[in-house]
Structures are given as C-alpha cells and as structure tokens.
Amino acid sequence: FYFDFIRENVNGDEHFWTSQAGSSIHTGWAGRAFERVCMQHVSQIKDALGFSAVVSSVHSWSYKGEKDPVSGKTIHKGAQIDLLIDRNDDTINLCEMKYTNAEYTITEEEDEKIRNRKEAFVRETETEKTVLLTMITSFGLTPGGYSNDIHCQLTMADLFR
C-alpha cells in the first residue's frame, strides 16, 4: 500500500487517493488485499462451506509448467493456486478469490485458467480426492454461463459472519 499510494504522492495531493480509485494500481492492490483477508478468515470459509468440524489443512500450490525439450512448445501450462483446503473427508476445496465492485463474471478465458489450475493440480499431485472449485468473491458470481462449473460460492459477507 505504501509503495503504491503513499510514496507516489510526492506532492501531498489530498485528492491522490480518490484520483487513483478504479485505476489498475488500485484494482491490483484491492485484489491482493482481498486475498489476504480471505487467508485470514479460513475458519469462516470452512464454516460457510459447512465443514468446520472436519479436520483440514490449508496450503498454496504452484507448478511451473512443462515444455518439450526439442521444440520448446508448451506441453502443460503452469498454474498457481493461492488457497487449497485439504480435508480429511477426501475432498479438496480449490479456492479462487476475486475482488470486484459488483458480481464477478467468469469469462471464457478465466474459465480456461480455472480449469487448467484444477487439471494441473490433479495431474501433478496425483490426488484421488474430490476437488471442488470454490469461488470467493466480493459480491457473488453472475449467474449462468461459466459460473455453472463452480461447485461452491462464497461472498465477502461470509467472511464476517
């Protein structure tokens, strides 16, 4: 926050913060801040998903991807998952966290990224557990379209119950 919004305000402009609202810098910061809030509220996430009594562990996971050594073509794309909840009931919640000022719409491109993350995780970890796609958004998902592929949905309000 300091590097993006305090240090950059070298002239002491009292309207600097409001002038940055909606900018790519502000949007990026808000997304990172929302992810941090989610990470600090895992017990509320578990409760909202209905498995607070199930023993579980929280992880992140990443995979660099794989390229053909001869052609250099991508064999498997890389993937990063910021929040995995690995439950003792043979289920893993693969959590995507998205901050927006309204309902979040999953585009075709975003759907492909989410599916790639899940496929890479299952393939590389060789898990036999059920993997549930879980979206945590500020104001919910736009119904229909690619949101039908999401198993569990939570909103920011669920983090503060």
Question: What is the role of each PLM region?
Answer:
Residues 72, 109, 143-144:
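Short glycine/threonine-rich loop-to-helix capping motif typified by GTGT followed
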Residues 127-161:
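Domain-level recognition of nuclease-like catalytic cores that cleave nucleotide substrates
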Residues 1-80:
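Accessory nucleic acid-recognition modules appended to NTPase machines
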Residues 42, 81-101, 114, 133:
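Conserved catalytic cores of phosphodiester-cleaving nucleases, focusing on short active-site segments
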Residues 100-120:
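Mg2+/Mn2+-dependent nuclease catalytic core
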Residues 119-129:
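Arginine/glycine-rich "motif VI" loop of SF2 helicases in the C-terminal RecA-like domain
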Residues 2, 94-96, 106, 145-148:
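Short conserved micro-motifs at the rims of enzyme active sites and ligand-binding pockets
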